[in-house]
Amino acid sequence: MNKKNLHTFHVPVMGLAFTIDTPVRISKYGINSVISIVDDALMEKMREYYCRKSEIPYDPISDKAEDYRAKRITAYLNLIDKIVKYEFEEFKNLALEDSSGLEKYIDMLPEDSKLKLSYKKFTKKNNSKEELKRWIQKNLTAGNADVNIMTKVDKENYYKNEKLPVEYNDAHAALRGFAKSNLNSSLILSAGLNPRLYSYIEKFEDFYPNENGQLKKKIILKVSDYRSAIIQGKFLAKKGLWVSEYRIESGLNCGGHAFASDGYLMGPILEEFRTQKETLIQTTFDILSLSLKNKNRLCPDLPMDVKITAQGGVGTYEEHQFLLDYYQLDSIGWGTPFLLSVRFV
C-alpha cells in the first residue's frame, strides 16, 4: 500500500544502534524512522530482548547456521513489524475509551494537515462511538519502519576457509534479510553505487509494481547531489527498479559526521533538484518502462510517486519550513535532536 506521509519530518538512521528499535516507540504516531541492518548480532540480541518483553517464544539463530545473517535480519524485522502492528491496534482501540492518545496523535501533525483539519471538523459533531471507530480505521496510519544498508559495507565471507558466493556478502545478505521480511516499507541505500548489490535487488518480487501500480517494498537513494541521483536512478531503472525517494544528505553538516565532497552547500544542490525533478522522473520512467516490458512485467502507464527529501544541519522550525516551501521537499530528516529524547532512541 502506498501512503502519503502524515508528517513533514522523519527520523533518519543514527549509527548502528540509536534507532535500532525506534519504530516500536513512535510508529503508532504515524512517524517514519529508519533501522540500520548492518549489525546482525545486535539485531539478534534485540530480538531476544523484545521476545522476552512481549512474551513471544524466542528461537535463537546461531552464527553457525547457514545464511544466519539474512535469517537474523528477517526474524528481527518480522518481530518489529508484528510489535508495531499490535501496538498500533492497541492504540486505536484505546482511543475509543480515552481520547488523550488520539489527541496527542493529532496534535503532533502539522497545522495545515488535512487529517488534523478533518479531525477538528469531525469532533464538532456529536458522533457515536461507532462513527469514531470508523473514522479512526479510515484515517490513522502507522509510521514506516524503513531500513538502511551502507552499500559499500559488503565484506566477503568465508566458511571453512572457502569464500562463499557473492550473495553471502554482508550487504547482499542484509538486502535478502529485508526482502524476505513482512515489512511494507523502504530500503534506503547509502554510501554510493554498488552495481552488484543493485543488480541483486532484481531477484526480489516485492520491489516490482503490482497490478495496481503499487510497491510493497520501495527504494530510497541517499545522495549528495543531483548527478549522483540521476546516475543511480537510471542504473536501477535499467533493472526494472523504481526509486521512490531521493534523500539528499548534507556532506558538510549531518549529525557530527562529514564525508568527502566538493564543498557545495545544500542550497544550490536542492535548487537543482527543484528545477530538474520532472526531468529526473521522466528520464528514469522511460528507462523503467522499457525494462519492465522486456521482462514481461506489469508497467504503470504513468510514473509512480517520487519524493524529494533532505536531512542534515537543520536547526530551527523556520529552516524546516523554508526547505519545505521553497525547495518543495516532502520531508526533512531530524536526527540529532531526537538523540536527546529517550522516547525516540
Regions found by a protein language model. Give the residues of each.
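Long, compositionally biased, glycine/small-hydrophobic-enriched stretches that function as flexible linkers
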Residues: 1-197
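Structural signal for hydrophobic packing residues in well-ordered secondary-structure cores
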Residues: 46, 50, 54, 84, ...
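Charged, low-complexity, helix/coiled-coil-prone segments
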Residues: 110-122, 142-144, 170-180, 210-232, ...
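Hydrophobic faces of well-ordered beta-strands that scaffold small-molecule active sites
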Residues: 145-155, 160, 185-191, 217-221, ...
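Gly-rich Lys/Arg/Thr-decorated short loops/hinges at beta-loop-alpha junctions or inter-strand turns
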Residues: 151-159, 181-183, 213-214, 258-272
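Core catalytic machinery and nucleic-acid-binding channels of phosphodiester-processing enzymes
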Residues: 166-167, 175, 181-195, 204-207, ...
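Glycine-rich phosphate/ribose-binding loops and adjacent secondary-structure elements
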Residues: 221-345
